């Protein structure tokens, strides 16, 4: 058996095993989901399979467009070296700020990425234990890292750990999609979204993914 290293994530399945069950549940419980789910065929949520890279991409993408985020990410990954889908925390930690800024990162995002790398290199995140921890415990651990708030932690739960029942109420796209699909475009409060999401449990991550897809047919990835 190979030895684990600090920050090394356990293998994550590429797609959730619960997906088909979740789709059946949602179609039974929600008339909008019953119409939405068949529109997207066999496409489903997929994990990149690397914890550090997923979190780093979330930081890079904060407050900029998807297109701009991809451009900055590609330049940043090239500066780090290695595969852009599996960046090594140690290489990021050793990167000079000037090179990071040259990739298009703000000074603040450079600080965040270096702090993230430091947590992984120093073993201050308990990656090997995440599989046995509940969602809120993981969120608490992640938000201790600079630049990671609750929204970023929830995206990580959905896109990396493939947790089935996350409802990211701070996500603008989710609220916009609920407004479009359920309230004829009228503004939706977090409380209304939470109440609607009760019917989706225990598969609120899956419902959220389909709501996102209703706004943008391209699969969402982090």
Please name every model-derived segment.
Residues 28, 47-48, 84, 88, ...:
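A generic short alpha-helical patch detector that favors 3-5-residue windows
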Residues 1-43, 111, 131, 135-136, ...:
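C-terminal accessory module of base-excision DNA glycosylases/AP lyases that mediates lesion recognition
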Residues 13, 64-146, 201:
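Alpha-helical ds-nucleic-acid-binding substructure associated with the helix-hairpin-helix region
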Residues 58, 102, 127, 142, ...:
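Generic anion/oxyanion-binding catalytic loop in active/binding sites
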Residues 23, 33, 42, 49-52, ...:
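Generic secondary-structure boundary/loop-capping signal
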Residues 60, 149:
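Conserved S/T- and glycine-rich ATP-binding loop of Class I adenylate-forming
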Residues 54-59, 75, 95-99, 137-141, ...:
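A general alpha-helix detector
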Residues 30-53, 57-58, 65-83:
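A positional/architectural concept
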């Amino acid at each position: 058996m190979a030895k684990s290293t600090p920050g090394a994530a356990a293998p994550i399945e590429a797609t959730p095993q619960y997906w088909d069950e979740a789709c059946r549940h949602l179609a039974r419980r929600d008339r909008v989901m019953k119409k939405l789910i068949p529109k997207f065929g066999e496409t489903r949520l997929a994990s990149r399979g690397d914890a550090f890279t997923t979190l780093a991409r979330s930081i890079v993408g904060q407050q900029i467009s998807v297109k701009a985020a991809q451009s900055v990410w590609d330049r940043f990954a090239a500066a780090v070296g290695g595969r852009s889908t599996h960046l090594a925390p140690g290489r990021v930690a050793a990167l000079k700020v000037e090179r990071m800024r040259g990739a298009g990162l703000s000074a603040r995002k450079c600080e965040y990425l270096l702090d993230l790398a430091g947590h992984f290199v120093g073993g201050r995140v308990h990656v090997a234990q995440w599989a046995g921890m509940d969602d809120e415990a993981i969120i608490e651990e992640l938000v201790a890292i600079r630049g990671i708030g609750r929204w970023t932690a929830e995206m990580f739960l959905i896109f990396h750990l493939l947790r089935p029942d996350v409802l990211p109420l701070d996500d603008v796209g989710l609220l916009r999609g609920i407004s479009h699909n359920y309230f004829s475009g009228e503004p939706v409060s977090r409380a209304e979204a939470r109440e609607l999401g009760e019917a989706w449990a225990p598969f609120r991550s899956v419902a959220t993914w389909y709501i996102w897809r209703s706004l943008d047919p391209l699969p969402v990835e982090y």
